[in-house]
A protein has these predicted regions:
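Conserved N-terminal beta1-alpha1 strand-loop-helix module at the mouth
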Residues: 1-90, 97-125, 144, 151, ...
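A short acidic, helix-capping loop that chelates divalent metal ions and anchors anionic groups
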Residues: 38, 75, 132-138
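A short glycine-leucine-enriched loop at secondary-structure breakpoints
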Residues: 164-165, 178
Length: 218
């Protein structure tokens, strides 16, 4: 079972952030306190491999788990720490067989209907959203709000990471509604000051962890 603290500040790379490359994004996010990284690139090709290896090594040297989005074979090839799978990807069971018992495996579950028909027995966590409006994912499911997120999180058999429109200002609201972690993309990748946003988000996550230890929630 994954330590939920690892999920607290979850950064997902953005391949469409112009000159702010995924590698620079990851460095900025980790400096701000990111505790886990997911590499997401829907148009991945061999020309991206060099940067992917740089990101893997940067994360490894800082003891930050590094996951690949969707692609189990790529995760195995570059010896990533795990993979995150969507509803239309290969199953978590397949990922576990290929990547091994120590791999971190996550799955996207957007609503109660998907939760009812998704086998999470091989997963360490699941991601749910969008909690708030987001422009990063064009085909995102309907916004569920904190209350809708809580409905899914309360029934989940694994820790849940909130995603979608999350900022330093609303991160605590996600934790208070059952999130073990919050995942962000554009709050850092499309920010006017990415380093400042990463720092502020890190502080919000640290505050959430402190309050959880005190027993306020979680």
């Amino acid at each position: 079972m994954i330590d939920k603290k690892i999920l607290r500040f979850y950064y997902i790379t953005d391949e469409n952030a112009g000159s702010f490359t995924p590698f620079e994004q990851v460095k900025t996010a980790i400096k701000g306190g990111a505790s886990i990284i997911q590499y997401r690139n829907k148009f991945f090709s061999s020309e991206h491999m060099e940067e992917l290896v740089l990101i893997r090594e940067f994360c490894k040297n800082r003891d930050v788990p590094f996951l690949i989005n969707d692609n189990i074979d790529l995760a195995a090839k570059i010896m990533a720490d795990g993979v995150h799978l969507g509803q239309d990807d290969d199953s978590p069971e397949t990922a576990r067989k290929i990547l091994g018992k120590d791999a971190v495996i996550g799955a996207t579950v957007s609503n109660l209907e998907e939760l009812a028909c998704t086998d999470l027995s091989c997963c360490d966590y699941m991601g749910t959203g969008p909690v708030f409006p987001t422009s990063t994912k064009k085909n995102a499911k309907p916004v569920k709000g904190p209350a809708g997120f809580k409905q899914v999180a309360d029934k989940a058999p694994v820790p849940v990471v909130a995603i979608g429109g999350i900022t330093a200002e609303n991160a605590l609201l996600c934790f208070e509604h059952g999130a073990s972690g919050i995942a962000v993309i554009s709050f850092i990748s499309r920010a006017e000051n990415p380093a400042d946003n990463a720092h502020r988000l890190g502080l919000a996550c640290e505050l959430a962890l402190t309050q959880a230890v005190k027993g306020k929630y979680e």
